[in-house]
Regions:
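Interdomain hinge/lid region at the active-site interface
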Residues: 182, 191, 228-289
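Active-site-proximal catalytic alpha-helix in oxidoreductases
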Residues: 144-152, 173, 178-209, 219-232, ...
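Rossmann-fold dinucleotide-binding core
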Residues: 21, 111-189
């Protein structure tokens, strides 16, 4: 039948109240999105290189296949939620070669613009479409469907996939040209990086002054100085509990490096971002890579001579 009709049917076919979506990368973010989509009535076909992640997804009702090629044959709309540009580009190349008809790949990882464009080129060479759709939110927010999707690329596909975005998040923005969403994500992450260290600095000042950590959280969250980041991270700081991580410091450091390079390339000064970067680096040097990014609080406590 007509290709456009077939694509429309995948979103609201008679058998599927919601349609079919493929997900490559079933880790903290991908696994949570898959679970929410299954709950929302989507048929989710997934793959992850890690056997544990595959098994967890299978338990959540995801149909697990044995690789990106098999996934590309099974569905034409595919999410990539992967830890590196290399993994995303390799998956895009496999999908491009294996997909029997026009595929739409939603690149939802936070990657450099160079990597995002490499993904798009790999797909375009075989007549497929890439959408640049990074997410705003942590792993915990992914679980509670509290994500915001920044979407950019081919407009008609973004509009067609609106139900998908609202099946895994609470809101989405169509930001126009491919790559714009990643630029916006860098702007958002710059603020998250600064707010997280600022939250820790405030907690440490309060604790050093003898205030109760839980009380600092409660009072500051009710006032003008609060932020979404403070509300998510300060409770972890108060409890001095940084595992399991909803955003690992080691992965966050990669995101930080990408933003730093992006700002430098534009010749844009980022004095507060640069200052906060040093605190994250100190955390990694102390071996806190596997811990949540809120662990910058432990670094500042150490510097302040606070023992808990």
């Amino acid at each position: 039948g007509d290709e456009e009709t077939r694509m429309a049917d995948t979103v609201s076919g008679p058998d599927q109240p919601q349609g079919t979506i493929g997900i490559i990368g079933l880790g903290i973010m991908g696994g949570a999105m898959a679970a929410n989509l299954v709950r929302g009535g989507w048929r989710v076909i997934g793959y992850d290189i890690d056997a544990t992640a595959r098994e967890a997804a299978r338990h959540r009702g995801v149909e697990v296949v044995d690789g990106p090629a098999a996934l590309a044959v099974a569905t034409s709309d595919i999410i990539l939620s992967l830890p590196s540009g290399e993994a995303a580009i390799a998956s895009a190349e496999t999908i491009a070669a294996a997909a029997p008809s026009r595929a739409v790949v939603l690149e939802m990882s936070t990657l450099s613009l160079e990597d995002k464009h490499a993904v798009a080129r790999a797909l375009a060479s075989h007549g497929h479409i890439a959408l640049d759709c990074p997410l705003s939110g942590t792993g915990a927010q992914a679980q509670s469907k509290d994500l915001v999707v920044y979407a950019s690329g081919h407009g008609p596909d973004i509009e067609r996939l609106a139900p998908l975005f609202l099946g895994l998040g609470r809101r989405y923005f169509n930001l126009g040209d491919y790559g714009n969403a990643t630029k916006m994500k860098f702007v958002a992450n710059l603020l998250v990086a600064i707010h997280n260290v600022a939250s820790a600095e405030a907690m440490v000042l309060g604790m050093k002054a003898g205030l109760a950590p839980q009380q600092i959280v409660e009072v500051i969250a009710a006032g003008a100085g609060t932020s979404r980041v403070f509300e998510l991270r300060a409770p972890l700081m108060a409890e001095n509990r940084y595992e399991p991580a909803s955003m690992r410091s080691s992965i966050w450091q990669k995101d930080m490096a990408v933003i730093g390079a992006f700002a430098a390339q534009l010749g844009c000064p980022t004095p507060l971002f640069s200052a906060s970067d040093a605190i994250y680096r100190a955390g990694l040097a102390r071996g806190l890579g596997a811990q949540d990014t809120a662990s910058v609080c432990a670094v500042l406590e150490d510097m302040a001579g606070i023992r808990r």
